[in-house]
């Protein structure tokens, strides 16, 4: 915790094409080594692929995918009398979005398609259909929380 009071939350500007702060945050998650224009090109091409394959608005597909990936519960380690317990806690709204975006990009990178654009597009489409690795990650997180429900009274 900082000694000088709470840290001010930085706000991102909405992206120029879709006018969405979520899209800007996703671009920032995709970005490696500060190459933002490359990250933008990857995302916009992925959105074009989504539009082409589904015939729907890519923003709607992306928002549905994000909704399906965002976790409601997670476990946090809590030390009680020399033992570490995995205590299930609710995820804060801003952290839910951050985790959802992070998992989408992380599991898109692990896919086997040739280009990052294809990987990202397919991961977003899979997530929108409630399949894919990012959705599995959310399910695993929820399963962990459910398995450790007995320790819920240690919440802080």
Swiss-Prot record:
Provide this UniProt record's keywords sorted from A to Z: Ribonucleoprotein, Ribosomal protein, RNA-binding, rRNA-binding, tRNA-binding
Looking up SUPFAM superfamilies in the UniProt record yields:
Ribosomal protein S7
Concerning CDD domains, the annotation shows:
uS7_Bacteria (cd14869)
Q: Which InterPro entries match?
A: Ribosomal_uS7, Ribosomal_uS7_bac/org-type, Ribosomal_uS7_CS, Ribosomal_uS7_dom, Ribosomal_uS7_dom_sf
Q: Which GO terms describe its molecular function?
A: rRNA binding; structural constituent of ribosome; tRNA binding
- Entries under PROSITE patterns matching the protein: RIBOSOMAL_S7
Q: Which GO terms describe its cellular component?
A: small ribosomal subunit
Q: Name one GO biological process term.
A: translation
Q: What does this protein do?
A: One of the primary rRNA binding proteins, it binds directly to 16S rRNA where it nucleates assembly of the head domain of the 30S subunit. Is located at the subunit interface close to the decoding center, probably blocks exit of the E-site tRNA.
Describe its assembly.
Part of the 30S ribosomal subunit. Contacts proteins S9 and S11.
Q: Which family does it belong to?
A: Belongs to the universal ribosomal protein uS7 family.
The molecule here is called Small ribosomal subunit protein uS7
């Amino acid at each position: 915790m900082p000694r000088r009071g709470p840290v001010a939350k930085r706000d991102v500007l909405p992206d120029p094409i879709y006018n969405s702060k979520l899209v800007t945050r996703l671009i920032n998650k995709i970005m490696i080594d500060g190459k933002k224009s490359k990250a933008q090109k990857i995302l916009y091409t992925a959105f074009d692929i989504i539009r082409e394959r589904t015939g729907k608005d890519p923003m709607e597909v992306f928002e549905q995918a994000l909704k399906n990936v965002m976790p409601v519960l997670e476990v946090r380690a809590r030390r009680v009398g020399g033992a570490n317990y995995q205590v299930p806690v609710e995820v804060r709204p801003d952290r839910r979005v951050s985790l959802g975006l992070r998992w989408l990009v992380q599991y898109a990178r692990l896919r086997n398609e040739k280009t990052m654009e294809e990987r990202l597009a397919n991961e977003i489409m899979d997530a929108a259909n409630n399949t894919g690795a990012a959705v599995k990650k959310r399910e695993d997180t929820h399963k962990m929380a459910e398995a450790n429900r007995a320790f819920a009274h240690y919440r802080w």
